Amino acid sequence: MKKIRENLFIQFLSFILLLLLIVTTVFTMNQYNAKKITRNNTLQLNENVLTQLIGKMDEMFISMQNLMSSVAYNPVVYAYYKEEEKRPLMQDDLKDVLINTLITDDYISGIELYNMEGNKLLGVGKKYTSTVSPEDINTIVYSEQILSDDGDNVKYAIYYPIYDLKNVQYFTKLGICVFYLSVENITDFLNEVRITDHTYLYVIDKELNLLAQNSIAKEDQDFLQNLEKIKDRYYVSEMKIDRNGWTIISYVPIT
């Protein structure tokens, strides 16, 4: 009888241990699946956010291009290029057109007009020095980094050719319109979205210069410097803006 009780106890104990093993396995699998689902959802959210940011920035460039077109072929601007002898009388009207354009867009810090010899006809806003020859600008061109004349701010230029509408078939250019893009406000795009509380967002240009970063990245200035040491703890995603070669990069912590 004693042996039977011992066998029953051993069987009961084995059953309990087996049950605990099953419960532990199920719990571990549930934890793993929950983490996997959370990770997949986070990565999908990251993909959606980057796509959204690309869309917003592309809309910004389209808006600026439309604005440049309206400036380049504004009757006052066009007449200023075509009727050289009347330029002194049109100076104030032309300046009003450029100033009104400047204040309608938060991303523009300066506007300049150049003739085909590369001489500046007029400029408003922050002063920069353009080194691009109008002869080389046949369509919209996005510049690399440009330093302002006072050395204080780095900006990017968008060059827009102005053609003689009466000689379009011969592609006769009158000059170029230059918009200087202020990149500080691009940070707002990055701060308007949220992936996780500890996700770093950056925008770099085609020369790998840093343009903008979200608030958490700005607070942690050592992050990029120590990237080689910590990059294995983050999912890294990149999306390029085809229009000008800029790239948005996200670092999502692995959990």
Residue ranges and their predicted role:
Residues M1-K36, N40:
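Extreme N-terminal signal-anchor transmembrane helix of membrane signaling/transducer proteins, especially
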Residues V23-V26, L53-K56, M60, V193:
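Histidine kinase transmitter module recognition
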Residues Q44-T139:
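Extracytoplasmic/periplasmic sensory segments of membrane signal-transduction proteins
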Residues Q91-D105, E135, K166, L174-K218:
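Solvent-exposed, extracytoplasmic
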Residues L102-V183, F189:
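Extracytoplasmic/periplasmic ligand-binding sensor regions of membrane-associated signaling proteins
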Residues T28, Y180, Y251:
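Short aromatic/basic micro-patch
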Residues N115, S148-D150, D164, T196, ...:
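Acidic surface patches and DE-rich sequence motifs
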Residues K206-E207, S215-T255:
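Extracellular/periplasmic juxtamembrane segments that couple receptor/chemosensory ectodomains to their
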